[in-house]
Amino acid sequence: MKVAIIAPTYLPSLRANTIQVMKMSQAFVAANNEVRLAVPEESTKEPATDRSWESLAEQYGLRERFPIEWIPASSAGKKYDYAWRAVTWAGKWQAEIIYTRLPQAAALATFRDHKTILEIHDYPQGRMGPILFRAFLKGRGAKVLVVISSALASDLQKDFGSPEIQLPLIIIPDGVDLDRYKDIPEPRTARLELINGTAWLNGENKASFQVERFTAGYTGHIYPGRGVSLIIEIARYLPGMNFLIVGGNPADVERYRSIVAKSQLDNVFLTGFIPNSELPRIQAACDVLLMPYQKRVSASSGGDISRYLSPMKLFEYLACGRAICSSDLPVFREVLSSETAILLPPDDAPAWVETLKDLSDHPSEWKKFADNAKKTAGNYSWENRVRKMLTALA
């Protein structure tokens, strides 16, 4: 089947949604579809210095190759001009399915009677969000609506329900590339590899990073609400543990490095951005992986996404086979349970400190959680997401 994927954001980018689009493109290819990906390109900006497949595959951890079309998009057009061009491009290619997270493209594609799958991760925003969403639902080509959490599905059904939502609505959380987590080393071995074979820890960081220490890790963006301040607070009370914080935009990383330096903490390490291809072996260096999301969580756009979260790190953590300490947010209980993670109050630092002490003192406890997490991860591959979408389409 010919599948045109219309991405909502620029490429390459540090945003999580570009990782998701690239992983989904790869998964559609793995399911024996002919895939082409459209991404916006601002005409007023110089192209990225390296958009070669080799560079993109390294940044996003890809194995399957697929063509990418950069389509002009003006900042004044607010993605409407891009949506028009991208849907036209898909039509000329005679795509059998259009899959997108861009509401403008979904509304136009269904109006033109293209079979369309729309995936959304948040409630339709602003004045135009609900209008575009309803336009998609009413279009002749609307075939499947994908949402990432039951909470989001419930709110959509309440506000846009029958008779508007008449197409299949399926709940599919985000996913993970399971193959990349096969045969990862045990934590101490991974830490040795981290010290000896990577540039992400260097200079003073490398000198103070102690391989034998119990290590807690966080990977992903460090926007407000992700809990990095809580991690730093916890680290003050656990000087005998390593705290590894991986990812983030340069400005955010420098801000937190400054806080760590002023606090004179030598057990907190911020690596900054690393390519997705490197992520499994760095996560493997941790004995426990942290998701200290707060009650209000910012996305790259600045909006609050705490009600509908389905972060990719959750599924990566499961696949890594490590203990997970997570904030006890209702949306996380759609995936996690007391068998797969330790769920903690997001604003109770002493509870996090005591839990990490307990895990460090009783390795058999974290091994139990890790084994259960690894088993659970098998349900959340990118390929499974694609299969569910195509099944709903049939």
Model segments located where?
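Nucleotide-activated donor-binding/catalytic signature segment of Leloir-type glycosyltransferases, i.e.
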Residues: 206, 213, 254-283, 288, ...
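Glycosyltransferase donor-sugar binding loop
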Residues: 41-43, 219, 242-257, 272
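Carbohydrate-associated surface elements
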Residues: 151, 175
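Conserved donor-binding/catalytic core segment of Leloir-type glycosyltransferases
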Residues: 4-6, 146, 193, 197-205, ...
